[in-house]
Amino acid sequence: CHNKSVIKLTNSEVSLCEKHFNIYFEKKVRKTIRVYKMVAKQDAIGVAISGGKDSISLLYILNKIFKPSKIKLIAVAIDEGIKGYRDPNFAYVKKFCKKLKIQLKICSFKKEFGNTLDEITKKDKKTIPCTYCGVFRRKLLNEKAIELGATKLATGHNLDDEAQSILMNQLRKNIRASAILGPITGIKDDPSFVRRIKPFYFLTEKEVITFAYINNILDKYVECPNSILGYRRTIQETLNDLENKYPGTKHNIISSFLSVLPLLKKSFESAEIKKCKLCNAPTSKDICQACVLLER
């Protein structure tokens, strides 16, 4: 059409106006959900939400797609207890969920683990906050999803996020962690684990930001002050540099990974899913990583 372009698609020469980009975005999400059979008619979907562009956009588009059906959406937020970080973001999350008439559940590290993340890292100055945060967040999201009756847990991970995770696992020689990745996480179904789905798997970070902006759902998001300390930030910057020099790099990483993912998952299918001896959570070891960290 002749309307003003709002974005030039990555890995393509196509430029789209606001109207046609929204159509493109929704079609891509619907296709990803359909092709990977992410959602069934009887599902209730927990949506991990932080207030950032990815999770807000995810809740917005899933509400649009599933509102006509009987599929229930439940927003789940985690308050890690980082000074000056969550309060302003959660104020918007509450307002946004109320507007969409979606149930919101907020749980905290303080209530569930006895300490905020700030308190934990003061006691253990040798370990970066991201180590605790990632493990505890995953544990809580799974537990709360089960408590709320969710059969799937949707996360806002986009193509950039997945490419970063793939590269991180390769550099750390963590093959099992790679096998758990993909549009639907995990290796096999287990009643103690809610499978995670990634409807934004084939959408770039640039596309998600553009979607949030043109639909006026992007609030002033306070970034986590600890993010600059994490290994992921280094990988993110490296991949962005490669993408700038060699456009299509991130798409190629995803495409190559998906071609070997079925073999990766198959190689770990026979692995036993154990129960943590301390908290009964699903784990590949005798004691889950969350309990290992809590015992420090």
Where are these regions (language model features)?
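ATP-dependent adenylation/nucleotidyltransferase module used to activate substrates
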Residues: 1-183, 202-215, 288
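Flexible helical/loop "lid" subdomain adjacent to adenine-nucleotide binding pockets
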Residues: 26, 34, 44, 152, ...
